């Protein structure tokens, strides 16, 4: 049998910021990925709700934000037990996960979220905001003041400290910098920002965002690492983040297509097809959310990362990736039915060409058989009607 994958990047993301997953659960996910020929693990370690990664350069971050609950730095948002919940990942934990991933042929990309999604970071280092900023920004998740300020020297002192350390921990050499969901009205009333924009001849907030990402990515390049970011890092008209960054298109396919046309390499992860935190049916008892779509098995299977009318874009669209955000996850086992069996469709789309990909009725035979195999391996499957 001769077979080869359509895409080089066949990934799965896991949000360990909203819910802390035990190291054993991450190793278990890597085993599942290997079985399905998925070869990239996007490890989302940091967000508004926690900074899970223990770093020697800023040890207080994980100590103060790793646990959430009454009396903690971050209140008890999300979680599934009485009292403070959470945890952190040590250098030893990282090494164990990387070693196991490597043995399975899987590369690991960590993510640090900037400039937004930084509430936990700012709770510990408030000096990364302009004290004279009168902006009243609120994130789509409802958090106020969750965005670091690129005009503050403390912001760059922090990034110049932590990014080299993170790069040294993860030898794959690809570091995701975030860059999604900048809140409306952010920085608008910051005197320091107004001064910076005048000095750098930046006209819009998007210009400032892209300048910020360029400067942050320069730090990684100096360390010999390659930057990655969400689609917003190149959604303007001024070239974007640059630095050979790998972009992830999440809100739909069009932002990724735009970036691919502009020469960026892109991983497609549109929420309407591969966000596995989305509910699988309209049943109100279904776990999950639905702000992007109801992601059924059909939705996960029936899409093409590359438009038929633009086949030349396949040279820049290097793969696809599933995402499991963890706002609705209360214990590690909840991961099972959110992933299985939809992750099988992810594997199918990432491996097979459009001409070879099976129709839904054909594919369901494989799903039914393979779900039983996974059940024997300890993975609980969502029961499809």
Task: Go through each PLM region and give its residues.
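Acidic-residue sensor for enzyme active/binding pockets
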Residues: 111-113, 181, 232, 348
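Generic secondary-structure signature for well-ordered alpha-helical cores
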Residues: 102-103, 164, 168-171, 218-225, ...
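Flexible, acidic glycine-rich loops studded with aromatic residues
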Residues: 227-234, 239-245, 249-385
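Flexible loop/turn segments at secondary-structure boundaries
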Residues: 20-22, 48-54, 115-121, 176, ...
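Hydrophobic alpha-helix position signal
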Residues: 33, 101, 197, 220, ...
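Active-site neighborhood of glycoside hydrolase catalytic domains
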Residues: 121-131, 135-245, 250-264
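Feature activates predominantly on carbohydrate-active enzymes
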Residues: 1-157, 162-174, 215, 219, ...
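Generic recognition of stable, solvent-exposed alpha-helical segments in well-folded globular domains
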Residues: 25-28, 89-96, 154-161, 207-215, ...
